[in-house]
Structures are given as structure tokens and as C-alpha cells.
Swiss-Prot record:
The active site is at residue 108. Pfam families: PGM_PMM_I, PGM_PMM_II, PGM_PMM_III, PGM_PMM_IV. Binds 1 Mg(2+) ion per subunit. The modification Phosphoserine is found at residue 108. It comes from Thiobacillus denitrificans (strain ATCC 25259 / T1). The lineage of its organism: Bacteria, Pseudomonadati, Pseudomonadota, Betaproteobacteria, Nitrosomonadales. Activated by phosphorylation. HAMAP family: GlmM_B. GO terms for molecular function: magnesium ion binding; phosphoglucosamine mutase activity; phosphomannomutase activity. This is Phosphoglucosamine mutase. Keywords: Isomerase, Magnesium, Metal-binding, Phosphoprotein. Mg(2+) binds at residues 108, 247, 249, 251.
Length: 458
């Protein structure tokens, strides 16, 4: 079944444009509420289902929170609200408080003009496609408020941050601490601004926090996991031992060593995998995505760690991990899954797994990744209008075939449509950086020409 509103990470768009309007989001809350009411599971008949709503620091979050609250309560669902809270915190709290669902108002790494809604199940995992499709189907039904006695109640919970801070600390061994380490943490002026520094401080680190002054408009602005020069500069300026960079909703992680060198999701997953292998608690293999650097795959093979690729999106990485019974996976962008620690990607928890590796071995990030060669990789995002399909572009198919011939087995080409934005992503990687760059530009030109020829403007 095709999905009209849900992408790879929930519903997302420009604030004030469908679907991110108060009217639509209220209907979305109502539709999700009706699905929850109809699928009560073991919930007693006289109890209302309860959902948890968290949000990042965008100014529009307050408006959308009120709309969701109205929709859910109109459907007879109780609502708990946390205020600004990282996405993985909502996943954890939904599970810990035994609620029926969690909802996050966030557009992750996007600028403040965007926002989105994503859902977690009672187990703290992203909803399966079938449930999202049921919610979409319910959106077509009229909004009919339940009888007054059946209306849901809404209230704020005050101890959400403290609960989550303790959870994060519990994923770090009791016998270790971070005393003697100076750590820069970039919170992207986002949802982790009030929890990430506390977690690190309470574990003993000397913390230098940047990107921790949200004003509703500066989330992800020249900071955070999608703009790592800010972290690198701060690490060097403060003579820190290490740096941690999170994105606006706290589910992505990048790190920097003492020299300001940045380590992406591929490299950090490798650090965790290698440490777990060396200490005897690596179970199974690693799941990456179509975008995971080929050098990471080769490095894992050299230490005899199995590796699989999933479609882009942490939900698909999670699906393959469950299918294999493995625990560790992630994306180049910094979504890292450590399923023995959490049910979803968590930037803070993942950073603690890397810090554990460094503390237990005395190694640096550079030493851990010395045998990991990251191959040159070029990504070009080609804007397109909705409706452009690569499958209809014969000229692009020919260009890719020519490019593969030029690479002669020494690299990879990936073309895919973004799940959250109207873009075609062209990725080429290989050992020869110049050849990789020329190849990516050739394919991107072919995509632009094909889009223009089909009268779907770029």
C-alpha cells in the first residue's frame, strides 16, 4: 500500500504547509488515537490508552504539541507531555512508563522552518509500516469527538529528564568513570541541551557545552552533527580530550579526537565493534546501509566481523538486526544502534559506548581506526519535484552503466530518492578520488537533464 504522508522517519515538512499545519496535525493525533483505541492489547477496558509527547526546541513545537494533544484527547487517549526531550528519551520513557505509544515533534537535523511527527510503539521502537498505514487510512475518516466522559486527559510530567539521565548513565559500566577527561559536547541548540552535559558531568567529565542555548530558531544552525567544524574548533580551542556532536533531536552522533579530526557513524560503529570483539562480547555482526563506506566493510571483514547492508534509514537497519539476532548497526550520518543498550538510535548512549572503549583500552580514536581506510566518497544531492522517477530515466541508466565500467570494480555507485526531501542522492565511492568525483558529477548531470526533459523542474 502506498503511503501519502509517512516517509522513512515519520511525517515531515515545512511548517505551515500540509502536512505540518495545526489542522492536519490535530487530525493526525486523532487518527493515531483511534488506531490505539482499536488495538488496546492487554489494556483493561476501563482504562484510557496513554501516549507520551516530546519535542525538540523549534518554535513551532509548541503549536504542534497543542494540536496533537487536542487530537489525541478527542479520540479518548490520555496524553503525557515532557517538553523538550531527545527522540531516544521518548522511546525509552514510553517503554519504561508502560505507555501505549510515544510521539516526537521534530525534524531532526533540518532547520527550524521544518518540523515533523514520528511515533514509537509501546516497546520503544519505531512503528511498523502496517501501523503507519492504518493511521493514514484513519486520516480519511471524519473527526468525531468521543463523548465528554470518554475524553482523554493531558498533563505534563516533571521528572522526564532526570529519568532519562539515569538511564543513559546506566549504559556505562559502574566500574568506570570519565574523571580526568575534558569533553566538548555540541547539543545543536536542540533537545539534548539540558541532558547531555548533565550525563557527562555526572559521570565525572569536565564538560564544555556548546550549542546549548536554544531560542526556537537556532536549532542545527552552524552546529551539531551536520556541521562538525563547530565541534572541531571548540575541541582545539579548549584543549579537550574528545568532542561529541549531536543533532537537533539527539539521535545522531559524530565525534572528534583531541586534534579536531571528525569521526562519522561508520568509524564509530567500527570502534564499538572492534572493542566488543577484543573484549569478547561482540554478538554476531554489523548492519550498515547502502551508504556505508566500502572501507568500513573491508575493515570489518579483516577482523572477521560479518557485515550486511540495509536500505537507508535506521528503521531498516533495525529490521535487519532483528532478523539476524545482532545488536550493532548504524549509518554514516551518525544513527547508531546498540540494541543491547537501547531500542533505538541514541546519540548520548552511543557516545558512551565509544567512551567505554577508549577508557577500557587507553586507546585514542585514531589508534582504534588506524586500520580503517575510508575510501573517497562523493555525495551530490539533486533537487527534484515530486513525481520524478529514476526508473523512467533511461539516460540515467546508461550513465550509471558507463560509470560502472569506468570504475572497473574499484568502487560503488548508489542512486536513491530521499525519504524526507524532494532529492535524488547520487553517491559514488572508490579508491581513486578524482575518478570518483568525475563519475558522481557525470551521473548528477544525467539526473538533472532527465528531470528537465520530463518537464519536472529541478
Amino acid at each position: 500500500m502506498g503511503r501519502k504522508y509517512f516517509g522513512t522517519d515519520g511525517v515531515r515538512g515545512k511548517v505551515g504547509e500540509t502536512p505540518i499545519t495545526p489542522e492536519f496535525v490535530m487530525r493526525l493525533g486523532y487518527a493515531a488515537g483511534k488506531v490505539l483505541v482499536s488495538d488496546r492489547g492487554s489494556l483493561p477496558a476501563n482504562e484510557h490508552p496513554t501516549v507520551l509527547i516530546g519535542k525538540d526546541t523549534r518554535i513551532s513545537g509548541y503549536m504542534l504539541e497543542a494540536a496533537l494533544e487536542a487530537g489525541f484527547t478527542a479520540a479518548g487517549v490520555n496524553v503525557l507531555m515532557t517538553g523538550p526531550m531527545p527522540t531516544p528519551a521518548v522511546a525509552y520513557l514510553t517503554r519504561a512508563l508502560r505507555l501505549q505509544a510515544g510521539v516526537v515533534i521534530s525534524a531532526s537535523h533540518n532547520p527550524f522552518e521544518d518540523n515533523g511527527i514520528k511515533f514509537f510503539s509501546a516497546s520503544g521502537q519505531k512503528l511498523p509500516d502496517s501501523v503507519e498505514e492504518a493511521i493514514e487510512a484513519a486520516l480519511d475518516q471524519p473527526l468525531a469527538t468521543v463523548a465528554a466522559r470518554q475524553l482523554g486527559r493531558a498533563r505534563r510530567i516533571e521528572d522526564a529528564a532526570a529519568r532519562y539521565i539515569e538511564f543513559c548513565k546506566s549504559t556505562f559500566p559502574n566500574r568506570l568513570d570519565l574523571r580526568g577527561m575534558r569533553i566538548v559536547v555540541d547539543c545543536a541548540h536542540g533537545a539534548t541541551y539540558h541532558v547531555a552535559p548533565h550525563v557527562l558531568h555526572e559521570l565525572g567529565a569536565e564538560v564544555v557545552a556548546i550549542g546549548n542555548e536554544p531560542n526556537g530558531f537556532n536549532i542545527n544552525e552552524a552546529c551539531g552533527a551536520t556541521h562538525t567544524p563547530a565541534l572541531a574548533d571548540a575541541v582545539r580551542a579548549h584543549h579537550a580530550d574528545i568532542g561529541i556532536s549531536l543533532d537537533g533531536d539527539g539521535d545522531r552522533l559524530m565525534m572528534a579526537d583531541a586534534h579536531g579530526r571528525i569521526y562519522d557513524g561508520d568509524q564509530l560503529v567500527y570502534v564499538i565493534a572492534r572493542h566488543r570483539l577484543e573484549t569478547g562480547y561482540m554478538k554476531g555482526g554489523v548492519v550498515g546501509t547502502l551508504m556505508t563506506n566500502l572501507g568500513t566493510e573491508h575493515a570489518l571483514a579483516r577482523i572477521h566481523v560479518p557485515f550486511e547492508r540495509a536500505k537507508v534509514g535506521d528503521r531498516y537497519v533495525l529490521k535487519r538486526l532483528h532478523a539476524n539476532g545482532w545488536f550493532l548497526g548504524g549509518e554514516t550520518s551518525g544513527h547508531i544502534l546498540c540494541l543491547d543498550k537501547h531500542t533505538t538510535g541514541d546519540g548520548i548512549v552511543s557516545s558512551l559506548q565509544v567512551l567505554r572503549a577508549l577508557r577500557e583500552t587507553g586507546k585514542t580514536l585514531d589508534a582504534f581506526t588506524a586500520d580503517l581506510e575510508t575510501y573517497p566518497q562523493v555525495m551530490i544531492n539533486v533537487p527534484v519535484v515530486k513525481g520524478f522517477r529514476l526508473s523512467d530515466a533511461a539516460a540515467v541508466t546508461v550513465a550509471v552503466a558507463d560509470a560502472e565500467s569506468a570504475l572497473n570494480g574499484s568502487g560503488r555507485i548508489v542512486l536513491r530518492a530521499s525519504g524526507t526531501e524532494p532529492l535524488i542522492r547520487v553517491m559514488v565511492e572508490g579508491r581513486d578520488g578524482d575518478l570518483v568525483r568525475r563519475t558522481a558529477e557525470m551521473i548528477a548531470d544525467a539526473v538533472r537533464a532527465a528531470a528537465a526533459a520530463s518537464d519536472i523542474a529541478v
